[in-house]
Amino acid sequence: MEAKSGNGRTLLGAAGARLRRRWDVAVVIVIALLLFAPRFSGPIDLRYDAGVYYLLGTSLAKGEGYRIPSEPGSPQALQYPPLLPAFVALHQVVLRTTDPAIVAPWLRTSYIAMFAFFAVAILTLARKFLRPAAAVAATALSLLHVMTFFMSDLLFAELPFALAAVGFALVANKEPLKSRLWPRELAAYALAAASFLLRTAGLALFVAWVFDALIRRRWRLALVRAAMAFVVVALWQGYVERVRTSNEYLHPAYEYQRAPYQFYNVSYAENVALTDPFRPELGRASIKKLVGRLATNLCSMPAAVGEALSTKDGYWREALRRFEETFRRLPPGGSDFIPIIPENIVLVPIYAFGMLVVAGLIAFVRRGNWLIPIIVLGSLGLICTTPWPGQFSRYLTSVAPFLTISGMLGWSRCSSVLRAQDLIGAALRARQLGWFARLLQWGLAGLLALTFAIQVRTVFRVFRVRQNDPPAFASALEGREGRHFFYHDAPWRDWEEAVAWLGANTSPDAIISTTSPHFLYLRTGRRAILPPMESNAATARRLLEAVPVSHVVVDEMGFLDVSRRYALPAVQDDPATWQVVHSVKGVRIYERTPISR
């Protein structure tokens, strides 16, 4: 009995020792699971670009090629690389159905597992450069960011891209024996290629991979890496060019199907060549405008990076207002609120984090590690070329792990240089400025504590709003019971209810114009397209009728107002032909008459 008792204590002691050694892994897994706990069940969110990814996967699963089946003529796709659609197709093939009511919940399960792996991968990478506590902090900053868990709720490429990018950095940062060089190179290549085939922004990983070898003067290795990267990039760009020069592309199913503003149906290069893709009447961007765009985006990047490490500017301002209301004992959300604390004070922690990232990148370079700095700078450079500053927070989600690790490295380095034993700290104390060094140390600690407090508050707020917002209007996608999603407010619910009416009251061959065409197709089976973005109402109406569009949905969506700005004037100017046949609060459905049913 004593021997058994001793063995039991030994096993418990060993388990306790392992737990103490791996407490950091346990912490980040718990954070990841807690972030998914309120949303374990139900389908993955298929709004926005997610609907396109799902439909492309359906086309692949059915053996119909890489096409968008929701569009008239099912045109070939060339905007999105094919790896995420292939991932969707794999689920559909295994489940033997393309029905989103069955497949979407399984996709959510896959994203839960992916999110857990993502958390552990960030921690593993962070531990290469940081102490365990700082590595956990870097991982938590990334996981608790509102955009990270929002992107994990959508069938978007951001989460798998970020996982592949972190995996690439883990593999490429290893220094194995020469005999293991090529297995490592092949693994790094596979992960970089996967990143590129998820989002073309993965080009930054290839660039970093090649430059890493050049900086280390491994000329032959750099040449081999460049050749390997060229193969993947050339294959995708060759496919894009083949589609663009095809007869089908040059003679589309309807006149504006391949217009440059049709961002789902054209290449990135063609879309970003516009001055503003959502205001195509401004025309193509000249060299001067492109340079101006780059300069403007570069100026806004420090704040965007600071927000990517903490939270979005709006949540900082909201927390500041709530603090002031509580301190002054004012009712929350009062319309007559006059702030005493300047709102722009929130820019101090935001820019401070941006500076910490710079300090961290410098620390990487001083250590001789160029890979992560080049990934970060290359990714930021690509983002700066885009005309969508409102999308920066989404794009930065994919590189957020590198930003948080760099930021925490900068934080750790700044904290250490202020200590008494460090040269700078000792110099300050020698000049009787030790109080200033301690003040800066407390400031750094306070910055981190404040950021975590704001992030946790934002998590609770966003989840509370998710629960209080109206659930999705029941359809085949959600089943009998509507589900809750992030940022699914009343305009979305009204749109879904209006779309349900269309599904019940239109013929199967109807073509509908709406701001969310792919999601409409998934919910109703009706072909759907974006409205023509033409400032001339008569031109827009002619294009709609030439498709021919049978119904136009004018919504109140906040994320995209093209139906109100372009489609509404077109149908309102011809009340004899276009009449309102149904409305749900602010959502109106116009029908072209006469329509044979």
Predicted features along the sequence, with ranges:
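Multi-pass, polyprenyl lipid-linked donor-dependent membrane glycosyltransferases
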Residues: 48, 106-114, 137-167, 172, ...
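Transmembrane alpha-helix segments characteristic
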Residues: 31, 142, 187-192, 346-385, ...
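Loop-to-helix entry region of an early transmembrane alpha helix in multi-pass inner-membrane enzymes
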Residues: 82-86, 96-120, 151, 155, ...
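Hydrophobic, aromatic-rich transmembrane alpha-helices
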Residues: 122, 301-368, 407-410, 415
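Transmembrane-helix signature of polytopic, membrane-embedded enzymes
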Residues: 24-29, 101-104, 122-144, 162-163, ...
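Signature aromatic-anchored transmembrane alpha helix within multi-pass, membrane-resident enzymes
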Residues: 24-30, 190, 206-207, 211, ...
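Start-transfer (signal-anchor) and selected internal transmembrane alpha helices
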Residues: 1-37, 218, 222-228, 351-352, ...
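Membrane-lumen/periplasm interface segments of specific transmembrane helices
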Residues: 219-336, 447-464
